[in-house]
Amino acid sequence: MIDDFAPTSSTGDAALYRLLSWLSPAYPVGAYTYSHGLETAVEDGLVHHRQSLADYVATVLHDGAAAIDGPLLAASWRAAQAEDHARLDELAVLGAAWRSSAETALETSAQGRAFCDVTQAAWPDSRFAAFCARHDESIVHPVAFGVASCWQGIPLRAALFGYLSAFAANLVSAGVRLIPLGQTDGQRAQAALLDDLQRATDHGLNTALEDAGSAVPMLDLFSIRHETQYTRLFRS
């Protein structure tokens, strides 16, 4: 089992390079087009400054989608490590069904499909290609990311912490544009989330899927209401 990066190892460097590439805003999965209901929260005045933005993202990490996607990513990584393809297929179906609104389903499935396409093109792996082909449009981002991370030699904790950090950073970026905030305040909000990200990572690593779930109906309602919001910059 791969536990950590070896800083002096070329293998560790290669895995880190892949992870950083996949988490970059330049990786073409379209993350920047989604606000995860934040646009409606800003419209309602619930999120209106740096602290309320950080609080919103922390809530998503602990009780929202990340509380599901963390355990889902970890389970996918472990199933890929075991080469348990039947379990991977189950997780792909579960991940697609485990969404609270049409827009959150679109958000994760569109990014999952885009991640499959670009990762197969740039970092080809026959097992990953076959897995993505079996699920076509239904594969969600955390499942695809967990599977690819395992088969490309990226340690589980690094993959999960990185995935959640990129998810949080994308929401902060959306908040900077929507509220609006200055870039420095955006970075302060991001810095304030470190403890939340570490706790969310621990939750993802240590929570069985049967014990995972979200518990923030207000966030779900923001996402549902966003579907008919009059003026929108984001797809969710």
From Swiss-Prot:
Record carries keyword Cytoplasm: yes
Coiled coil (residue ranges): none
GO molecular function, one term: nickel cation binding
Record field: transmembrane: none
Main location: cytoplasm
Annotated compartments: Cytoplasm
Gene Ontology, cellular component aspect: cytoplasm
Pfam families: UreF
Keywords for this protein: Chaperone, Cytoplasm, Nickel insertion
Cytoplasm keyword on record: yes
Family statement drawn from the similarity comment of this UniProt entry: Belongs to the UreF family.
Subunit structure: UreD, UreF and UreG form a complex that acts as a GTP-hydrolysis-dependent molecular chaperone, activating the urease apoprotein by helping to assemble the nickel containing metallocenter of UreC. The UreE protein probably delivers the nickel.
Function description: Required for maturation of urease via the functional incorporation of the urease nickel metallocenter.
Protein name per UniProt: Urease accessory protein UreF
Organism from which the protein derives: Granulibacter bethesdensis (strain ATCC BAA-1260 / CGDNIH1)
Lineage: Bacteria, Pseudomonadati, Pseudomonadota, Alphaproteobacteria, Acetobacterales
